[in-house]
Amino acid sequence: MCIFDTIFLVIIMDKITIFLIRHSEQLKINTLLNNSENSQIANEKIILSVEGEKKAEALSKIKELSNLNSIWSSNYVRALATAKYIAERNNLSIQISTDLNERKIGNLDSLSKLRDKFTHTFTTEQLLDENLKNKDGENRFEVNRRMTSFINKLLAEYTGSKIAIVSHGASIKFLLMNWCSLNENFELFYKNKVLKIDSPSVIKLEFNKNSLLNLSQIY
């Protein structure tokens, strides 16, 4: 084996691909809970809609989500319900981390008062101000810190692997701010390409050790 073959082999072995997946379409429900703890529990238990189940199953069939080494999910029901189809097709067990949980919104009464002062949605306002925080909730900085810490653990432990992680809209956007910018419409973009974090969607992150090589939307 020549030196160039050796270098190429090392690069391949160090390469890690992470598929960052937003859960599928959730069931639309109304809640009258204003207590921060109760509303958080209710949010964690929201299931997928009938259409969301169909979309999650269709998502699992895309070619790039085959031959995975590991699949991770938040502990929210809708994330696990999305992950189950991918896990089944790859014959994997779902591993759970609360680091992948959605941004905690906090007290709904307090949020309602905050929204009266907003020009944009709460998530957009947080994208513009990493320290903006509702009572009993999380700001962008806090969510980014736990999401980034989780990604760094994967990069350290899963060299040469393909990993899927199922998370949530705000948390994914806050993580992507590590590499992306906002355009005039407050949309995330990377290398002039706009990213649509829909339910569901897949962002492919390719790393060599801790360095991002490429970021692209594949679904």
Task: Map each language-model feature to its residues.
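Active-site-proximal alpha-helix that buttresses catalytic centers in soluble enzyme cores
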Residues: 15-95
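Generic beta-sheet signal
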Residues: 17-18, 161-169
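Phosphate-handling substructures
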Residues: 27, 42-47, 88-146, 193
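Glycine-rich phosphate-binding loop signature in dinucleotide/nucleotide-binding domains
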Residues: 65-67, 154-161
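Conserved histidine-centered catalytic loops in small-molecule metabolism enzymes
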Residues: 66-99, 119-126, 203-219
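Short beta-strand scaffold positions
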Residues: 73-74, 145, 166-167
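Domain-level recognition of soluble alpha/beta enzyme cores
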Residues: 182-211
